Swiss-Prot record:
Localization annotation: Host mitochondrion; Host membrane
Designated gene of the protein: m011L
Function comment: Plays a role in the inhibition of mitochondria-mediated apoptosis by blocking the activation of mitochondria-tranlocalized BAX thereby maintaining pro-apoptotic BAX in an inactive conformation. Also inhibits apoptosis in a BAX-independent manner by interacting with and inhibiting host BAK1.
Domain of life where this protein originates: Viruses
Membrane topology (UniProt): Single-pass membrane protein
Native organism taxonomy: Viruses, Varidnaviria, Bamfordvirae, Nucleocytoviricota, Pokkesviricetes
Subunit and interaction comment: Interacts with host BAX; this interaction inhibits apoptosis activation. Interacts with host BAK1.
Residue intervals passing through the bilayer: 138-160
Record protein name field: Apoptosis regulator M11L
């Protein structure tokens, strides 16, 4: 599911030609992407409209952080990752369009990257735990199968020896 979410984000945002794109064009793309993800995967993407309409164009960094925190409160790790990717892409592209000082949003982008790494770490840790748990269980199953086969073989060998009288 995570890869499909990220694909949806990148499809909507990377198909836009920055040189020909106005702020409104980009925000329309973001709106379409939010609609698509909202219909398909998540409930809280409508809160990203608040970020778009009120905060990104006015560069209100505090509100962007607060709204993002609210939007991600109940989201699964994969939805968080897609949202963070989406917001980072939009902010970077708006910086390119407006030719603003990239340092203005560097703090937000750094925070997003750090949060992405935490989410990725959580997903990897969960997968590692599940894999280890599965391997332990399947390893335990293999041992019990081998023991059962050995006992059955030993009993069959004993019955065969008894039947032959040797």
């Amino acid at each position: 599911m995570m890869s499909r979410l990220k694909t949806a984000v990148y499809d909507y945002l990377n198909d836009v030609d920055i040189t020909e794109c106005t702020e409104m064009d980009l925000l329309c793309q973001l709106s379409n992407c939010c609609d698509f993800i909202n219909e398909t995967y998540a409930k809280n993407y409508d809160t990203l409209y608040d970020i778009m309409e009120r905060d990104i164009l006015s560069y209100n960094i505090v509100n962007i952080k607060n709204t993002l925190t609210f939007a991600l409160r109940d989201a699964s790790p994969s939805v968080k990752l897609a949202t963070l990717t989406l917001l980072a892409s939009v902010i970077k592209k708006l910086n390119k369009i407006q030719h603003t000082d990239a340092a203005m949003f560097s703090e937000v982008i750094d925070g997003i990257v750090a949060e992405e790494q935490q989410v990725i770490g959580f997903i990897q840790k969960k997968c590692k735990y599940n894999t280890t748990y599965y391997n332990v269980r399947s390893g335990g199953c293999k041992i019990s199968v081998y023991l059962t086969a050995a006992v059955v073989g030993f009993v069959a060998y004993g019955i065969l020896k008894w039947y032959r009288g040797t």
